[in-house]
């Protein structure tokens, strides 16, 4: 009887994982390229959408929202106040918010691992490894955002004697690398989750096939023995035992199905939250790029005016007619 119960439970496990894995929305869809004149407008729209679409429910999501809110507050300050704060206060505040976010993520991961307690130890280890990798990538991205506020201003000051075209090129390249890294992390996480779920489904199918091969001869023997029973009282007792066994199997199967459905829903919820988090981070980085462009635009224009004035003075000094300074390519 124990063997029959095990066969039914494994069969239910295979049925629960038989759903087809949907294709990831971030896979196979290249990011559309925008015209140069439409890119600032598009980035501004993405920034507004990111702020409106951010819905924080879990404690770690609230902590991450406070991190981005503090960045937006710093960007609204005047240039002089920012220069005074960037050296110490802003870095310390961002470090505190980042550590708070990591602490909440760790607590949420511990809660998830506790919910997956009835699962096999190998499955628990794989889930913990995936979440730990995602947490490490998020920490790296937040540390990079924290250091950009102090590094980029120094780079701009060091490039005052260079052309504005080189300044714009370095700025655009820097932001593209940051955006690509966030997209790469999101796609990598999706691939790892897809491989994990496929492995679990394949293992369940192999287990069901193996148990069927082992139990089929026993079932055939039981049928033969039941058919050869000679007396009616013995048949009645066997029928009663069979009904009792079916009732117990149905009860065990119902409990197993309920638990497996709950575990599958929890895994799908975790995957959906991680995908949503990665998409929101990508939108917020693009919005941050638009803000930095608008921040340093006055500095570039001032450099152009100074250059034009210097050329005009030199031309007047040598007695030549003023010429139009070269225009910056956009």
From Swiss-Prot:
Stretches for region Specificity for association with VLDL: 291-303
Annotated segments matching region Lipid-binding and lipoprotein association: 226-303
UniProt-annotated stretches for the region Homooligomerization: 279-330
GO biological process: acylglycerol homeostasis; cholesterol efflux; cholesterol metabolic process; lipoprotein metabolic process; melanosome organization; phospholipid efflux
Signal peptide start-end: 1-18
Compartments in which it is found: Secreted; Secreted, Extracellular space; Secreted, Extracellular space, Extracellular matrix; Extracellular vesicle
Coiled coil (UniProt feature): none
Keywords linked to the UniProt accession: Chylomicron, Endosome, Extracellular matrix, Glycoprotein, HDL, Heparin-binding, Lipid-binding, Oxidation, Phosphoprotein, Repeat, Secreted, Signal, VLDL
GO cellular component, one term: low-density lipoprotein particle
Major place of residence: secreted
Molecular function per GO: cholesterol transfer activity; heparin binding; phosphatidylcholine-sterol O-acyltransferase activator activity; phospholipid binding
Sequence repeat start-end pairs: 96-117, 118-139, 140-161, 162-183, 184-205, 206-227, 247-268
Region (Disordered): 21-43
Modifications made to the protein after synthesis: APOE exists as multiple glycosylated and sialylated glycoforms within cells and in plasma. The extent of glycosylation and sialylation are tissue and context specific.
PTM-bearing positions, type Phosphoserine: 163
Residues that hold heparin according to the record: 178-181, 242-249
Similarity section: Belongs to the apolipoprotein A1/A4/E family.
Function: APOE is an apolipoprotein, a protein associating with lipid particles, that mainly functions in lipoprotein-mediated lipid transport between organs via the plasma and interstitial fluids. APOE is a core component of plasma lipoproteins and is involved in their production, conversion and clearance. Apolipoproteins are amphipathic molecules that interact both with lipids of the lipoprotein particle core and the aqueous environment of the plasma.
Record's protein name: Apolipoprotein E
